[in-house]
Swiss-Prot record:
Binding site for UDP-N-acetyl-alpha-D-glucosamine: R96, R125, P126, I127, D128, L129, D309, V331
Residues that bear 2-(S-cysteinyl)pyruvic acid O-phosphothioketal: C120
Catalytic activity, as annotated: phosphoenolpyruvate + UDP-N-acetyl-alpha-D-glucosamine = UDP-N-acetyl-3-O-(1-carboxyvinyl)-alpha-D-glucosamine + phosphate
Keywords per UniProt: Cell cycle, Cell division, Cell shape, Cell wall biogenesis/degradation, Cytoplasm, Peptidoglycan synthesis, Pyruvate, Transferase
Annotated GO MF terms: UDP-N-acetylglucosamine 1-carboxyvinyltransferase activity
Localization in the cell: Cytoplasm
Name by which UniProt lists this protein: UDP-N-acetylglucosamine 1-carboxyvinyltransferase 1
Pathway the protein acts in: Cell wall biogenesis; peptidoglycan biosynthesis
GO term, biological process aspect, one: UDP-N-acetylgalactosamine biosynthetic process
Cellular component GO terms held in the UniProt record: cytoplasm
């Protein structure tokens, strides 16, 4: 079992960092390749992450050829032959995002069986919106013993209103609707950049998807989809994590190829704090003087609101800003587990329902801590950079799901950080 060791107290990050392709984009893109009954689909700018290997194995388990070339960050998928209709439990159980294969398998085969997914233990994160949407399109859904079986000889276009703009449900229903008879309208759809990226791929494959990035999606079904080539967008959450890292260490960092528009909700809060954030030709530059930063109030919301996947990292920034800040989590319940670990490092905080109050600017000390989920693992490492002494972060399986060589990138920026194997 690996662990990360951080020596903190005087860290000041500077330099340039390269951002990978987006984890939250590539997983549904890989699911979408299932829909291509003609030709090969090539995805470029694919990040080397454990979740990508897991999704590759989910798709491969459907008797689909998947070739991942790590040297050039490319995945080639050939789903042109007959495919199986049951996703392999061994891999689906590891990752929540694997539920997005349900819609593509059903649309392609008329029958699909997928186990309830695994992943980070953040609240209940129900999948009822996925299932209700498919039922509205004519699917019969049966849930028995942790397995979901969906049947529909041919999905029918429908008008679907989602009670909450779920990203995963929007993606699942988008993909299913591409091969349905007639027109499907999804109202109160998710608007994240990853939704737009998926719509672009689907249209490149021959689909007819309109409205991506707005609250209303209109998908006109077609008879079949074909392979294509598509570049995965940059990871806005990784970019945001390095923006926060620069801000909390009084750093000066260029986040190369980061997309300003994708990160606008986070950038607006950094600017409100007093962080200097500027768009440059090669990316986004973040400069900061922690002693001059002001506390802020943040509320996570579906895009274009502040991203829930940046909540833990922003908490780490709040910890070094003098005064009382607050952060409200409205997307997922039970997503403050990292605060208990940060308290071991001297963080003063309290939680009232869905809001955490952070008393920042007080001394932090290194400690042994454990990652509780993917983004919390990054937050603990960032906190370790500004805490006096040595911090050891364990349970790195979470980190590897969403960050590629995170410790190496931080080290190149000036952090005293290493990753070691623990017997």
């Amino acid at each position: 079992m690996d662990k990360i060791i951080v020596k903190g107290g005087n860290t000041r990050l500077s330099g340039e960092v390269v951002i990978e392709g987006a984890k939250n984009a590539v997983l549904p893109l890989l699911a979408a390749t299932i829909l291509a009954s003609e030709g090969q689909t090539t995805l470029t700018n694919v990040p080397i992450l454990s979740d990508v290997y897991t999704m590759n194995n989910v798709v491969r388990g459907l008797d689909i050829a998947v070739d991942f070339n790590e040297e050039n960050n490319t995945v080639v998928v050939d789903a042109s032959g007959e495919i199986l209709d049951q996703a392999p439990y061994e891999y689906v159980s590891k990752m929540r995002a694997s539920i997005v294969v349900l819609g593509p398998i059903l649309a392609r085969n008329g029958h699909a069986k997928v186990s309830m997914p695994g992943g980070c233990t953040i609240g209940s994160r129900p999948i009822d919106l996925h299932l209700k949407g498919l039922e509205a399109m004519g699917a019969k859904i049966i849930q028995v013993g942790g397995d979901i079986t969906a049947t529909a000889e041919k999905l029918k276009g429908a008008t679907i209103y989602m009670d909450f703009p779920s990203v995963g449900a929007t993606q699942n229903l988008m993909m299913a609707a591409t091969l349905a008879d007639g027109v499907t309208t999804i109202e109160n759809a998710a608007r994240e950049p990853e939704i737009v990226d998926l719509a672009i791929l689907l249209n490149e494959m021959g689909a007819n998807v309109k409205g991506a990035g707005t609250e209303k999606l209109v998908i006109k079904g077609v008879k079949s989809l074909h392979g294509t080539q598509h570049a995965v967008i940059q990871d806005r959450i990784e970019a945001g994590t390095f923006m926060v890292a620069a801000a909390m260490t009084s750093g000066n960092v260029l986040i190369k190829d980061a997309i300003w528009e994708h990160n606008r909700p986070l950038i607006s809060k950094l600017l409100e704090m007093g962080v200097d954030v500027k768009e440059e030709d090669r990316g986004i530059r973040v400069k900061s003087d922690v002693s001059k930063l002001k506390p802020v109030a943040v509320k996570t919301l579906p895009h274009p609101g502040f991203p829930t996947d940046m909540q833990a990292q922003f908490t780490a920034l709040m910890a070094v800003v003098k005064g009382k800040s607050s952060i409200s989590e409205t997307v997922f319940e039970n997503r403050f587990q990292h605060l208990e670990e940060m308290r071991r490092m001297g963080l003063h905080s309290e939680i009232l329902r869905d809001t955490a109050m952070i008393h920042g600017g007080l001394p932090l000390q290194g400690a042994r801590v454990m990652s509780t989920d993917l983004r919390a693992s990054a937050a603990l490492i960032l906190t370790g950079m500004v805490a006096e002494g040595t911090t050891t972060v364990g349970k790195l399986t979470h980190l590897d799901r969403g960050y590629y060589k995170f410790h190496e990138k931080l080290a190149k920026l000036g952090a005293q950080i290493s990753r070691v194997s623990e017997a």
